[in-house]
Each structure stands twice: as C-alpha cells, then as structure tokens.
C-alpha cells in the first residue's frame, strides 16, 4: 500500500500538520475581532476564544430606550462571534490546504 518510507513520510506530514494546527489555534485564541451594531454605535471586541474584552457604546444611545440598547449589544456580540468563526475557518483552511472538516467538528478542538 505504501512505498518504501511512505508510511514514515505520512506520519511525519501528519505530525507537521498537527504542529501547525496547534500554532494556529494559539494564534486564534490571541486574536481580537470587533463586532458592530447600529451602524457602529455599539461595538464589542471579542477574543478568538469568544471572551468579550470590551463593549463600546456611543454616548448618544445612553439617552435612548434601554431595550434597544440591549438589542444592539446582543447584535454586536453575535457579529463579533460570527467574525471569530470566519477567522478560525480562514486560518485553519491555510493550514489544512482547504481540506474541509467533518460536519459538526469545530476548531479549536
């Protein structure tokens, strides 16, 4: 099935890919993205591990409806989470050469 040294090369390649994926996972955890809502009136900065680092609210919103502000904060959080997911997929595609992960498998593992 494998030529001379084929299995050894395959194992070496698998180890290299695993090392690259671990490095990318660390980079993803350290990255920060900012999600926005209300045309930038509410901004949420989130890490690659989905921890919210900062919430920025335009002062003009503090005089308005509390419920609207809550909705905008939730929307900005969701936008930031979506951006984290997009960045994770892009970075992992670079490592895996575009190979798709099985459905339901998320990165980092």
UniProtKB/Swiss-Prot annotation:
It holds the Pfam family YbaB_DNA_bd. It is found in: Cytoplasm, Nucleoid. One of its GO terms (molecular function) is DNA binding. GO terms for cellular component: bacterial nucleoid; cytosol. The keyword Membrane does not apply. Keywords: Cytoplasm, DNA-binding. Binds to DNA and alters its conformation. May be involved in regulation of gene expression, nucleoid organization and DNA protection. Homodimer. NCBIfam families: DNA_YbaB_EbfC. Belongs to the YbaB/EbfC family. This is Nucleoid-associated protein Ssed_2851. The lineage of its organism: Bacteria, Pseudomonadati, Pseudomonadota, Gammaproteobacteria, Alteromonadales.
